[in-house]
Every structure is written in C-alpha cells, then in structure tokens.
Amino acid sequence: MSAGPAKNPSVVTRFAPSPTGFLHIGGARTALFNWLFARHNGGQFQLRIEDTDRVRSTKEAIDAIIDGMRWLGLDWDGDITYQFERAPRHTEVAEELLKAGKAYKCFATAEELEAMRAEQRAKKQPQRYDGRWRDRDPSEAPAGAPYVVRLKAEQEGETTLHDLVQGDVTVKNAELDDMILLRSDGTPTYMLAVVVDDHDMGVNHVIRGDDHLNNTFRQLGIIRAMNWDAPQYAHIPLIHGADGAKLSKRHGALGVEAYRDDFGYLPEAICNYLLRLGWGHGDDEIITREQAIEWFDLTSVGRSPSRFDFKKLENINGHYIREADDQRLTDLVKPRVEKTLEQGLSSTEQALLLQAMPFLKPRAKNLNELAENSLFLFEKRPLKLEEKAAKQLENTSGSLLAILRKTLGDLPAWDSESLEKALHDVAEQADLKMGKVAQPLRAALTGRTVSPGIFDVMILLGQDESLARLDDQLSLSPTHS
C-alpha cells in the first residue's frame, strides 16, 4: 500500500446538513469527504444539524440524516450540535459587532427595498443593498420602527480565498453588500449562525459543495470583523447527472435510504462509489475503507463536476455483494423475500437461503436481484413460469423431460458428480448439446431462464422437490404421453 499524504492531528471538519429533507446523495459525498479527511489526519469530525428553518425542519428528516450517517459508517466525534439551540450565542456575536461599530441597524422598509431593487433592475445594475442606513444615526428612524442588523462590510480592495480545491479565487469587496445578521424579529440569519458555530466548534477545515463558494466571501467578512482565524476552505464540485445537467431526482439525487431500501445497495459500495466521484487514486476503482483513510487528501479532488453513473455503481455494488459474508446477505435479503412471498420464512427456509447464498451472489448486482433470484427456492408448486421460461418449455419435447425425470429419479446419489454425469448421459442419448438439456431443466425447476448453476439448483432443491417440479411440467406437457 502506498504511503498516504502527511497527517495533521489538529484537523477539525464538520458536516452540517439542513433537516428539511433526507440525506441526499450529494450531501452523503460531502459528509464522506469530511469524515475521510478527519480520519486520515487523526483529527475530529463533527456533525451539526442546521435546523434554524423551523417551518421546514422536521424530526423525521433529522432522524433520517442520523440514520443515513450511521448506515454509511460515518461516525462523528462528540455530541451532535443543533444550530437552533445556539441562537442566543449567534445574537450575542451580532450585538458585539454592533457595539464595535462593525454592524449597524437598518430601518429600511420592505417597500423602500423593493423600490431600490426595481430602480437597480431598470438601470441594469446588480441587485444589492445600497447601504442607505450604513452611516445614519438610528435616532433618525421613527420611534419603535422595526429594524434588521447588517454587517458593515468592507467596501475597498478585494478578498482572495486560497481554496484547497479551487485554488486562488478573488472577489472585489465592492461587489459584496451589507448582509443581514439579525432579522427584524431578532432571529439570527443562516450566514451568521454558520460562522459562529464553525468558530465555536473549532472547525478549521470547511469542505463543502462549490455552490457555497460565493457565501464564503460574505462569511469571511464576519470572521474578519470578529478578528477570528478563518478556517481553510475546500469547495468541491457538485455531482451532475449522466447528461451533464445538475443532479436531480431523475438522475439519482435521492436520499441514501432510497439506495438502501429501494435499490438494494450496500453502504460500502455507496461510499466507494461516492469517493470516486471527484477523487481518484490512480486507476484504483475498488477502494477499501482502510485504503480510503490512508490515501485521502484534498489535492486529488478534481475541479470539474463528476457525472453520476448508475451502471458503474451497480458494478461496484456487485463486487461488494460477491465479497460480503453469506450470513449478512441472508439477513439483508430475508425481508425482501418475505415481502414478495407475503409470508415469513421458516427456520428451515432461512437455512436454505443461507446455503444458497454462495451460488446466488455471483449473479446479483443488488439485494433486489439477490432476493429475486432466490425466490425459486420457496415458491409453491406448480411454479409460475416467467414468459421466457414458458417459451423454453413449449419448445422442448415432453420426451426429453421424461428422459430427464427417469434418469434423475433412478440416481442413487444426489451430488454434483452424479448429476453432471446423468445430464451428460441424457444429452448424449438425445443427441443434444449440454445447454439444450440444461436450459429446459432450469426452466422446469426454477420457472426462470436465469439461476445459479443447474447442478447447484438441483442440490439446493433436493431430489424429491426437483423430481416433483419435473412431474408438474410433465403433467402439463402436451407432447408427453
């Protein structure tokens, strides 16, 4: 294993989702990058729930985010920070800035601000607050008039951000207006809360999507006004769909619970795939968690958006299914099988599923396929045939099935060697290639055209069940007398 980049144990990162929805796949990648950077350095990874939007934030979404993080194996250090609970501290910082003359009260009414924006639109000017209360005395406002608190942003010069992914990015300070810190009802804004929380939590590396890049320059204004040390920033490109458009639900911008529950992916496959979306280590596609922790750094994160590719995710998931422990897969597949069968599996059937797992998993790319491919073991006779399997049997003479039934029925031993010899004998007797014998037999025994190897199928079903299923098809075959 190649040596990873140098380590810095003082690193503190954070993942700060808003609980207005589930943990979507883009957020999961952001969490993963923060977690890996902290774990690589032997530092701290913290979780903050940004629940200041009291209308849209829900307990269900908070629970889903925490559940998603745990499922992905992204453990955090210390207690979860809930942003809403820290509102008094955010207000305290705004009051400090007011006292220091680095923030001011703005009494502009909604009507005045709308007229200002309309004039800016008419003149084709950028729409931003014009600072009309920046240098006015609050005594000029009507008594008891509502106000917001705004940051007195720097107006001269420019700000350069040394971004760990994007490189140097420079913005003229005149392009940044005096943003609101406290609303007219006294509640702190998101922009203020984020800066205060990052500072108080000791966060010194902010790794987030590049859609936050513009916010960073505004947040740096608060940091400078408070004379705080700024964290290092790394703005990672967003994930796009396969067509190059911004990732949406039709591309796969869903919550991680959909990938787990609906699509049947394993968490290690999701993490491996998300890691490779925007970060690379040579030509390595399959990267274990241990390797990811050892190798991860921000210098290998690309600047271009990555494209979400379900096919690649399926292939990676197939790899992890093949590598997974049989008992673990059995436990994961069991509820899916029971849901389809609309009944629970007995202890004997569960043991059969476990016994079948080594033969089932090489052909499955997700847990749904694994469950689907195992159903033949538990379906009641006579089997419902898939359309392709029914056609296969329609095109097979009843005499071939009869020869198979007799040959298999006469076998004294029911093992791979005996079964293989028996099928070869039937193929020779009927002057057919092995596949022409195995395919209709598979259809008769499983009701499908895809299954584990035919000898594995017969051993799993056992002699009695295999012969009974053949008898069912023989009784339906018009060419069998």
From Swiss-Prot:
Organism domain of life: Bacteria
Cell compartment(s), UniProt: Cytoplasm
UniProt GO cellular component terms: cytosol
Binding residue positions for ATP: 249
Motif ('KMSKS' region): 246-250
EC numbers on record: 6.1.1.17
Biased composition (Basic and acidic residues): 118-139
Subunit structure of this chain's protein: Monomer.
Summary of the function given for this chain in its UniProt record: Catalyzes the attachment of glutamate to tRNA(Glu) in a two-step reaction: glutamate is first activated by ATP to form Glu-AMP and then transferred to the acceptor end of tRNA(Glu).
Name used for this protein in its record: Glutamate--tRNA ligase 2
Organism per entry: Zymomonas mobilis subsp. mobilis (strain ATCC 31821 / ZM4 / CP4)
Gene: gltX2
